[in-house]
Amino acid sequence: MPWLCYAAGATLNDDIKSRYMDIRVGCGYDVHALAEGLRLVLCGVEVPHTKGCVAHSDGDVAIHAICDALLGALALGDIGKLFPDSDAKYKGIDSTLLLNEVVELIRSKGYSINNIDCTIAMQRPKLRPYIDTMRARLAEVMGIAVERVSIKATTTEHLGFEGREEGVSATAVVLLIEA
C-alpha cells in the first residue's frame, strides 16, 4: 500500500503485529476406510460398532483432521509429515498422543488454541450419544475448556462413501491466538 510509510526495514506485517493480536486459522480433513472387526475410535473415544477404521495408527479421523488444522494454522506441514506412516513407532498408536505432541508444538511456537470445530461424517452409528464424551476427552488432551471444543456429526443421506458405510471423514477448523 503506497500511501503507508514505514520506518527503514519495517513492513505492513510489522505494523499489523504491533496493532492487532496475531490470530491464525487452520483447516484439516481426513478420511479412512471402514472394515469389519476393527475398533472405531473418534475423538479419543471408542464407539461401539461392527466396523472400524483401516489405518496405520488407531485411525481416529477426527483427531487427525484436528492435528492437520493445528499444523496448517502455523504452516507446519501436516500429520503425515510429522508422524509418517512409514515409521513403525506409529503403528497402532493412540491418536491422542499425536494430538498432545502437536499441541505442545503449537505452544512452543507461542500460540494457544482459542477453539476448535470438527464435523464427523458417517452414516452409522449415530454419534449423538458420544458427543459430550468426545468433547470432554479432546478438551482434556488439549488442555482447553470444553466450551471451546465443538464436535458435530452428520450423515451424507446415504450418498458417497460415507453413505455407503465404506468410510468416515472429518473436517476441522481451529483458531489459534498468539499467547
What are these regions (language model features)?
Residues Y20-D132, M142:
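RNase III-family endoribonuclease catalytic core
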